[in-house]
Amino acid sequence: MHRLAKVSFLLIVAASVAVSLFAAKKEYFTEDEIDLIRDAQDLTARVPAYFNLAERRLIFLGLMEKSAQQIEKEKKAKEKRAKEDKKSVDTRATAKKAPLDDTSYLDDFTPAELLRGYIQALEEVTTNIDDAYSRKLDVRDSLEDLAKFVGDTLPMLEKFKPKNDVERLALQDAVDKAKQAAADTKEALSVVPKTEKKRK
């Protein structure tokens, strides 16, 4: 009898662990991307970092091209890393992670997952803006940036041609999320006062 109770308890624990693992939110960012976000502590750094991750997904899907400014920035960063690599001795302790300027690491994601990554980036931006606003921080610039980003990327999303139902659903979710973010941002911009300070 005691053994049966033990087995039943173990089965219940195993089932609850399996359910919690199944119900866990899927992550559409890589560990390196999460580190990049973690390093961008304040809102003015974090919002552009999320936009960058969303743009990478749109570029990888062929919906967007890198701007000349992005290409030049990546070239300078690559040259800077090359100089630093020559100066430092590369040991396991000092080894740096691979740079995130190349989008080839996104090969591991399906098109539907890339679209979900775009959605996750928008959700994170809106959550970060809401959090900053609740702490009485200035969010006007970030709201304006979000409005511009969604306005620029929504037409690109609508050009995506899904190949199956999973991609079709992910596309619809991405378009819906972008439209909702645009509507929410428009409403927030009518409430949040304009600031006089100039952008850096």
Question: Which sequence ranges carry the predicted segments?
Answer:
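Long, charged/polar, soluble alpha-helical segments
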Residues: 23-200
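Positively charged n-region of N-terminal signal peptides that target proteins for export
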Residues: 1-7
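Short, low-complexity interaction segments enriched in Ser/Thr/Pro/Gly
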Residues: 3, 22-23
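Bacterial N-terminal signal peptides
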Residues: 8-18
